[in-house]
């Protein structure tokens, strides 16, 4: 499966930058998750701690981190936003960022 990370207009990969900023143990888990998805595709998502946020917007939770994503089809997944998990629910402004980034790619989450 192809993973498409959200990048700024200047080409800055915000997802990889976030993973790089994590402590070693959490960073390793983030990379392991990426590798599982790349190799096993949609089946890998069943083994991960995922939950639906809104429409087609989902999140992967690991340690105290979230990666929000949209599954485009069986071959593409868009990682839209990564952040620290602050509360039990995804905070509204974090959701809004992911929704805006989905729109930047022309993806509908509804």
Describe the residue ranges of each PLM region.
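Conserved catalytic cores of phosphodiester-cleaving nucleases, focusing on short active-site segments
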Residues: 80
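Short, surface-exposed beta-strand/loop micro-motifs that present aromatic residues
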Residues: 67-70
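Basic, Lys/Arg-enriched alpha-helical interface segments
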Residues: 1-64, 74-76, 84-110
